[in-house]
């Protein structure tokens, strides 16, 4: 099969690779679409330890070609793959916290992933996709679930003021989720003018450039209280410090 193989940091090549060998508890997936995220860039640059050579990619969808014959999952089923693999036996796995499994691995980081024609994945890690979700949209489900997890932890109450800082993919998804949860207002903060414009199209009640404009604007939109919740999506210390200025105490 053809695959994108990382041989060393910065050396990603399209080349022939062996088709993965499917185990009895796995399905073989013909990968049709994938996504590239910040983790992939760090792996490519060598910022995350990984074995070489490696077929990258952990955001992927495709069709089952072998290994499943249930009503929901069978040959030809269009599916999304959960790339987080766990042992299924430890305390964390039994507690619904498989992402904390000490023996957990990630497809596309610790073992070959989805930037090839085929990938083998455990049957417990593949889910049927509804036809209402397009092939172009579906790879975003993986990052959407991480955002959704954060919102469930935050427990937004309708009418609370929420600020989203940073408008990459995660930030724009957080904006839309906050609106769905009933936050009002939802304020978006970024240095990028075109991202502020996009945020307004996606439902932001107000957008501001980071810095003094964001602080003044947030105070004005919350009657001087500050935001009930700030979602920081940049991951840099100066932005985190600014988040503490925007949130109420």
Residue ranges of model-derived segments:
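Mid-domain Rossmann-like dinucleotide-binding core that forms the NAD(H)/NADP(H) cofactor-binding site
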Residues: 133-212, 216
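Cytochrome P450 core scaffold surrounding the K-helix E-X-X-R motif
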Residues: 39-43
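Glycine-rich beta-strand-centered segment in the early N-terminal region that forms part
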Residues: 20-34, 45-91, 130-132
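Glycine- and other small-residue-rich loops at beta-strand/loop junctions that grip anionic moieties
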Residues: 53, 82, 118, 139, ...
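NAD(P)H dinucleotide-binding glycine-rich loop of Rossmann-like/cofactor-binding domains
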Residues: 87-165
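Glycine-rich cofactor phosphate-binding loops and adjacent beta1-alpha1 units
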Residues: 154, 197-249
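Short Gly/Pro-enriched turn/cap motifs at secondary-structure boundaries
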Residues: 7, 18-19, 51-57, 107-111
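Receiver (REC) domain switch-region micro-motif
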Residues: 79, 162, 226-230
